[in-house]
């Protein structure tokens, strides 16, 4: 017996008249007056289910087939035939239907045959991948993930696994989740009455990582080209459509590289992964274009064919001032541009993806390379039409004296970062990198308006279910 994924049958990979068995779940059942049932069976391998045509002469037709409801799991054996129905070229002429698992109560099944709101689906995150929309998101997410790994592999990068538990704050924002095994009901205290983290598991205060960048720098300064791709954590009390407490980051780090080098890398990577998803997940993208965002496909096609614009932060501020727009947030040199500013630049002024470079140092992290003007750093943001910032990066400060001065200026004790300073003490090199928020990328591709709907189990303030 040959078990076949539904995608192989529908794509014509298997020959007509061959006998196969598909395994999956019932999306719908329709019965005709002629004594034939039509089962829509999906297995998640592609967007569409396959239609199984079931005759009433099967021995379990009355006792089981006619009782199948949405969500029941089945194995259907039959012959692949050309389909006269619209929408797919092939269907299955069933010779056997085996029920693997029943839905106990079809009336109360949370994923019953009806369209559910996105908000409702968040409440049943353990069942929502069974829906068209979240199933499509999952396949697109996988495609993008595989394409990212493939891109860096082809470019000669080494993937490194950055630690999730750290004693360093890469962003200097202090919005970190503490990791501790201390008994909260009986905390050890030091002589000053503060919690004594010397008694904790790691012998010091530790946190969940906000970025793998600092660790990636250590490997870039030995392997030349590396990247991390893993979960990061931010304890921001933000209830927006763009924020999660747990999310995934793609962070390449390149030795002997400048800001311009990683700006080009960012453009090449985004175009590569968008071309991949357009080629590999067209069925899912067509669904998003029909149900979620009409521009889902054309936006990616235009992105891939566009030349990225580049502009200095100072010039970008002047463009915003000269726009005549009444922005919600005032535009002045030194601000951290808001989403409305970013989207104006990408969507209305440049009408293309744009890289903004050389930001004021006072709004950027300690590790960014200071420019000769003493006011700005070699930092960049990639702004995409439709979403705004999608990538943030910089050239790293490779000069030890300037790095030390910057840390002191920002209230960071250089001694606490001795291992990071060693990279500058022993064979320092110019190096650069960036961070891509993976959920924002998936949101951009699918048109899903909230990042909570593009990660399997979203972690947000007051919510850590499942």
From Swiss-Prot:
The record's GO molecular-function terms, alphabetically, read:
asparagine-tRNA ligase activity; ATP binding; nucleic acid binding
Q: State its Enzyme Commission number(s).
A: 6.1.1.22
Q: Name one GO biological process term.
A: asparaginyl-tRNA aminoacylation
Task: From the Swiss-Prot or TrEMBL record, state where the protein is found.
Answer: Cytoplasm
What does the subunit comment say?
A: Homodimer.
Q: Which NCBIfam families match?
A: asnS, PRK03932.1
Q: What is this protein called?
A: Asparagine--tRNA ligase
